[in-house]
């Protein structure tokens, strides 16, 4: 009963928030809102400089691998459990996934700076 009430409340609240966001009027975009602001002075140059897409992709790849490695941090504490085989299998699966992902990125030339 409590689970059903919680799910119903969450669904209704999410639906209400979506409806409010949908029915709110769109804000007007003025030229002042789209121009860059530098401490009250006119900007010295363009604030919208292009960035390297390769750098962005390498940075996203680094973040993904970093998050996956963070999953390995509790392994020393997990080794004290009674079910050691399951812990070792899960660690091996995670490390294998990391190795396969790295090999795939390498073969797709996702880690190279030159195009």
Curated annotation (Swiss-Prot):
Lineage, broadest ranks: Eukaryota, Metazoa, Chordata, Craniata, Vertebrata
UniProt subcellular location: Mitochondrion inner membrane
Gene: MT-ND3
Species name: Equus caballus (Horse)
Complex formation: Core subunit of respiratory chain NADH dehydrogenase (Complex I) which is composed of 45 different subunits. Interacts with TMEM186. Interacts with TMEM242.
One cellular component (GO) term of this entry: mitochondrial inner membrane
Primary location class: mitochondrion
Keyword Zinc: no
Role played: Core subunit of the mitochondrial membrane respiratory chain NADH dehydrogenase (Complex I) which catalyzes electron transfer from NADH through the respiratory chain, using ubiquinone as an electron acceptor. Essential for the catalytic activity of complex I.
Name of protein: NADH-ubiquinone oxidoreductase chain 3
């Amino acid at each position: 009963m409590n689970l059903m009430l919680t799910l119903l409340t969450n669904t209704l609240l999410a639906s209400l928030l979506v409806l409010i966001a949908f029915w709110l009027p769109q804000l007007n975009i003025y030229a002042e809102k789209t121009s860059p602001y530098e401490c009250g002075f006119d900007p010295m140059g363009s604030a919208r400089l292009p960035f390297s897409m390769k750098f962005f992709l390498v940075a996203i790849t680094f973040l993904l691998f970093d998050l996956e490695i963070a999953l390995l941090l509790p392994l020393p504490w997990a080794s004290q459990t009674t079910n050691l085989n399951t812990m070792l299998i899960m660690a091996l699966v995670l490390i294998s996934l990391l190795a396969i992902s790295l090999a795939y990125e390498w073969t797709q030339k996702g880690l190279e700076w030159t195009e």
